[in-house]
Amino acid sequence: MRPSALVAKKTNMELVNKDFEILTDYILTFHFYKYLNIDLIENWAIELINSGYESEAIYNLACFYKPIDSHEVQPYLEAVLSELNLTTKNKEESQKSHIRYFLNKVAKHDDVRGNLKRMLHLYCDFDVDKDIIDLSVLDDAWDDLIAGQVNWYYKDVSLDTIEQEVIVMAQKWLYEN
């Protein structure tokens, strides 16, 4: 394998590992958010298996069919968390994990507007920092621009550039947090 291909493969593996770490943190918010995408638990269990983790509890968790009922999956998830020595996040950690999960998707250009809105969905429950408030204002500006209204929030942002502005702010938040 050429050195450049090896570096590219290593970089790709680091991204996959980072995505898995972010997904794991998101799953560990299970007890705090009733709007958690429970269906991701199956994906997470499959990723565990693909990463070499094997146990009856993980296989059971991976066998749920979507849509997954949160009450039905809870004992299976708790068994896996116990087996892996993972503990659920407290409220503050859960907030950061929730934000990180969706901003990671935004930073990867994955349904930027939808994932921004999903991240902000629980906005009123968060003790948020300035950057999250700025993202909320950008979301409002985006709504105004789509409706053909004047954007009073960010003068230099247009409908053509707002998505990139959101991506840059998401990347900044991820880097700093």
What is each residue range found by the language model?
Residues 1-9:
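Short, low-complexity, charge-dense intrinsically disordered segments
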Residues 10-177:
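Acidic, Ser/Pro/Thr-rich low-complexity regulatory regions
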